[in-house]
Design a protein with these regions (language model features):
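Exposed beta-strand-loop-beta-strand "reactive/processing" segments of non-cytosolic proteins
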Residues: 1-24
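A short, surface-exposed beta-strand/turn
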Residues: 17-43, 170-172
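Short, low-complexity, polar/charged sequence segments that are solvent-exposed and flexible
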Residues: 11, 26-29, 160-167
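Long, charge-rich C-terminal accessory regions
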Residues: 57-156
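Amphipathic N-proximal alpha-helical interface segments
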Residues: 18-30, 112, 118-136, 186-203
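Long, charge-patterned amphipathic interaction tracts in eukaryotic proteins
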Residues: 34, 38-68
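Extracytoplasmic/luminal low-complexity segments enriched in Pro/Gly and acidic/polar residues
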Residues: 141-203
């Protein structure tokens, strides 16, 4: 950020999420830092993503294990800690995925959390079902990386998509599944763009 810095903010409790704020420097005043700001809706999106993971903790735990098995099966890897440090924060994220959504679609969830930050997982599940009963407004973007230099055939990502459709007890969402070359562009904190992909929905 010009005349400022992008600061990564991590929350561990009562919900887990990662986001960023821009802190502007007051260049005309000594030893002062300006007000922190964020892109519109970014923090709210991160909070709702963290609430979704809290509401469906068992399903996300299963997703973590399932993604690990898929990576082993197809000789792929996820984000390393170093890569996660380089990437732009996406709210709730794991080694193989990040959760993305329009928080305005989940106002019952968001407002209930603001009213009661200790809201239970059971209550959250009921609210998510109220706002989005099929999970069609929720996206869990799966990202895998190859170990070598050459992308596999499209068939590999299609097979992963088929495996997802056969797997029970995963969080409801749309699942865009992408396999990238194993390279993160430091300048923008994103994969280098070369990829193969598929998309499925779990309702």
């Amino acid at each position: 950020a010009r005349n400022g810095a992008v600061v990564i903010v991590e929350s561990e409790a009562p919900i887990q999420f990662t986001t960023s704020v821009i802190v502007k420097f007051l260049l005309n005043k000594k030893d002062e830092i300006g007000i922190g700001t964020s892109n519109e809706g970014e923090v709210e999106q991160a909070i709702v993503g963290g609430l979704y993971a809290k509401a469906y903790e068992a399903e996300f735990h299963h997703l973590n294990e399932f993604a690990e098995k898929l990576a082993e099966k197809y000789n792929l890897v996820g984000y390393t800690e170093e890569a996660l440090d380089k990437t732009l924060p996406f709210g709730y994220q794991g080694k193989y995925y990040f959760v993305t959504l329009g928080f305005i679609d989940y106002m019952s969830v968001y407002n209930s959390y603001l009213t009661n930050p200790e809201i239970s997982a059971k209550e959250l599940r009921a609210l998510f079902s109220k706002d989005d009963s099929t999970g069609e407004k929720m996206t869990i973007a799966m990202r895998f990386f190859i170990k070598g230099d050459k992308l596999p055939e499209q068939e590999v990502v299609d097979n992963i998509a088929a495996d997802f459709l056969q797997e029970p007890n995963l969080p409801k969402a749309s699942y865009p599944i992408t396999i990238y070359k194993n390279f993160i562009v430091n300048r923008v904190g994103l994969p280098n763009g070369e990829n193969i992909d598929a998309e499925i929905s779990i309702k």
